[in-house]
Amino acid sequence: MTNEQHLLTILAEECAEVGQRATKAIRFGLEDPAGAQPGFSSNKKRLLEEINDLLAVVSLLFGEGYVNKDQQKLKHQKIEKYTQLSKKLGQL
């Protein structure tokens, strides 16, 4: 396995973990203790931990040339466009 493959594997794992934590937060709320068990962090805290893990991998990929600031800006604009549409349709 190359270093690139290794980083891409970690990226895929972290993306899946962020998705899982995000859906738990949607289902049970951000402040609910994950799993409703004593001693567990809130869903928000666990989601933020996973997001930071993902960003750490993304920063490593940045060094490999995978991050493009222009593409990020276009994505931000696209998100804003569809956020406004969702508001117009009464979904937000």
Task: Give residue spans per PLM region.
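Flexible "arm" and connector segments at domain edges
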Residues: 1-51, 55-92
